[in-house]
Amino acid sequence: MSRFWTDKIASLDPYVPGEQPQDKKYIKLNTNESPYSPSPKAIEAMALEVSERLRLYPDPNCATLKNALAKSYQLDANQVFVGNGSDEVLALAFMGYFAGGKPLAFADITYSFYKVYAGLYSIEPKLIPLNDDFDIIPADYENLDVSGVVITNPNAPTGKALPLADIEAILKANPDVVVLVDEAYVDFGAQSAVSLINQYPNLLVVQTLSKSRALAGIRVGYALGHADLIEGLERLKNSFNSYPIDRVALVGATAAVEDEAYLKEICDKTIATREQSVKDLEALGFSIIPSATNFVFATHPEKNAEQIYLTLKERGILVRFFGSNKPRIGNYLRITIGTDEEMAALTAALKTL
């Protein structure tokens, strides 16, 4: 701790990302990265950009990417905001739409960065408990005196998806505040709320290229919503960093968005492997929460999750253990869906425990 720290710095409880050990080669099933390469078209576009154009600043408006996303989602370009990963997009949304003095509602078990943003912007979290089956109950989001609502769909780390009708019920119950729907994993089996954007001016949908498009390394995320909401994010961005996306990321992201056939191929492969992995894990006695993501959330009634995590790590396989002190999920493991070969290696290792 430095004597130059402000009270704000000292009060922060920063996000702890999944471990990235460098001591040896691991089968990485802990950070929900894609086991597959990005679109070949994206790789080709990025290689060309590296070789010829890095002396130039990127387009601060990210016009080509916004146009590609707008076309993909059947929106106007002014309904698209682009940022340096969905985490930056979320941070700007929290700053701009939720730091208004009232609490912000989100689930008690969800993406842990929300609490970090709340602390950073002095927002009081209003935690809405998931039910005993780890479901979000729309009725719990009615009659709230809050600055906004954040819903993760599918939820993380549980992997459960919320039907579109439930998202709409939450929107109807909160017409005077922004409802942010974080859809980082939506391509793996959930219903997107994008179709509701033109009907609900308070809806902001946030997505990423890190998961289904296998581009975690270039850090590109985006928000979709009513043009007025997007304009607010643009004002914040241009008051902080006018060039959030570098030239290489911009061309790679655009090519990936345009390659919808490759997106479908990756998602289909991941879903098929996930369903087989669920069967394999259940055969070993694990209980699996139904998943619409590229991971599964698993617990074993007779085995300690922390010990499983440590043993797997010793054998070169990384899974995510959030800590035995976490209420309700202290004996769960989050397991990213890898290739068929990687998941077979996981199953083989678990059989020996």
Curated annotation (Swiss-Prot):
EC number: 2.6.1.9
A Pfam family assignment: Aminotran_1_2
Protein species of origin: Marinomonas sp. (strain MWYL1)
Enzyme kind, highest EC tier: transferase
Catalytic reactions on record: L-histidinol phosphate + 2-oxoglutarate = 3-(imidazol-4-yl)-2-oxopropyl phosphate + L-glutamate
Record-listed N6-(pyridoxal phosphate)lysine modification sites: 211
Family statement: Belongs to the class-II pyridoxal-phosphate-dependent aminotransferase family. Histidinol-phosphate aminotransferase subfamily.
Keywords assigned: Amino-acid biosynthesis, Aminotransferase, Histidine biosynthesis, Pyridoxal phosphate, Transferase
Pathway connected to this protein: Amino-acid biosynthesis; L-histidine biosynthesis; L-histidine from 5-phospho-alpha-D-ribose 1-diphosphate: step 7/9
Name of encoding gene: hisC
Name of this chain's protein: Histidinol-phosphate aminotransferase
Quaternary structure, from the entry: Homodimer.
Disulfide pairings: none
Classification of source organism: Bacteria, Pseudomonadati, Pseudomonadota, Gammaproteobacteria, Oceanospirillales
GO MF assignments: histidinol-phosphate transaminase activity; pyridoxal phosphate binding
PROSITE patterns for this protein: AA_TRANSFER_CLASS_2
Listed GO biological process terms: L-histidine biosynthetic process
